[in-house]
């Protein structure tokens, strides 16, 4: 795997400033040592709507198990299929879960780093 994912809270202006800095580095021929995929939310409330404790539990279980069907994951977590299905689809939409060619879901990240800055 060897892929990392960074989650944080940034304003639209901060997001575009970071993207601009990365583009400048690319133009200068500077590439990151290891690519890191990113997901930013505008505020903590939105982040917590997507990243609930149950979804973190699901991510952890799926990462440990490897690729699973939603049915197998629901059984492992001892949760209702529909609830697991909904959570998997949300996590897939925001990029934290991927589907392999066999139709099974997996967490391809070795590390998910979350940064939450407190207001000054």
Region spans (language model):
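Short alpha-helical segments that sit at the start of domains
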Residues: 29-57
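A short acidic, leucine-rich amphipathic alpha-helix
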Residues: 72-77
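Short, hydrophobic-biased segments on the C-terminal half of alpha helices
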Residues: 88-89
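Short, cationic-aromatic polyanion-contact patches
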Residues: 45-52, 69, 101-120
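Short, locally clustered residues in the helix-turn-helix/winged-helix DNA-binding domain
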Residues: 60-64
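A short, conserved structural fragment
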Residues: 93-102
């Amino acid at each position: 795997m060897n892929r990392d994912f960074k989650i944080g809270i940034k304003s639209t202006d901060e997001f575009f400033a970071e993207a601009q800095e990365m583009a400048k580095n690319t133009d200068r021929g500077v590439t990151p040592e290891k690519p890191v995929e990113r997901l930013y939310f505008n505020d903590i409330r939105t982040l917590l709507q997507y990243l609930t404790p149950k979804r973190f539990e699901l991510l952890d279980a799926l990462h440990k198990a490897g690729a699973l069907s939603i049915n197998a994951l629901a059984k492992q977590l001892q949760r209702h299929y529909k609830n697991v299905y909904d959570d998997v689809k949300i996590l897939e939409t925001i990029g934290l879960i991927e589907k392999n060619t066999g139709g099974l879901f997996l967490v391809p990240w070795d590390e998910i780093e979350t940064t939450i800055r407190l207001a000054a």
